[in-house]
UniProtKB/Swiss-Prot annotation:
The keyword Ribonucleoprotein applies. Part of the 30S ribosomal subunit. Interacts with proteins S7 and S18. Binds to IF-3. Belongs to the universal ribosomal protein uS11 family. One of its GO terms (biological process) is translation. Keywords: Ribonucleoprotein, Ribosomal protein, RNA-binding, rRNA-binding. The gene is rpsK. One of its GO terms (molecular function) is structural constituent of ribosome. It comes from the Bacteria. This is Small ribosomal subunit protein uS11.
């Protein structure tokens, strides 16, 4: 049998000036997705994707590293102005926002917290006793 040739999909360089940085900061991980204004993903990264494992994924340093990785990928596509949507109660949320603001060549135009708040919905998890 002949071996099949594996071809990789070529990365198409888009030229997008404006975008949205979605930061999902959970208690266990921080996920960052950079999209265009229509919501199509341009670049993404997470603390676990960068090699942080276990409890190290939830640290502020891991969140900062995830933001820098996603923004560097997005800047290859020409991102210059971004808005930030942040969701979740994680420990890396403030550090992630600061990391986006400190990137050279990127201007933050707006910031919005889109964390869903329950109006007496599901019962929350019980308090930890250590």
């Amino acid at each position: 049998m002949a071996k099949r040739k594996v071809t990789r999909k070529k990365i198409v360089r888009k030229n997008i000036a404006d975008g949205i940085v979605h930061i999902a900061a959970s208690f266990n991980n921080t996920m960052v997705t950079v999209t265009d204004n229509a919501g199509n993903a341009i670049a993404w990264s997470s603390a676990g994707n960068l090699g942080f494992k276990g409890s190290k994924k939830s640290t502020p340093f891991a969140a900062q590293a995830a933001v820098e990785d996603a923004m560097n990928k997005a800047m290859e596509h020409g991102i210059k102005n971004v808005g930030i949507k942040i969701q979740g109660p994680g420990s890396g949320r403030d550090t992630a926002v600061k990391a986006v603001g400190s990137m050279d060549g990127v201007r933050v135009t707006w910031l919005k917290d889109v964390t869903p708040l329950a109006h007496n919905g599901c019962r929350p998890p019980k308090r930890r006793r250590v």
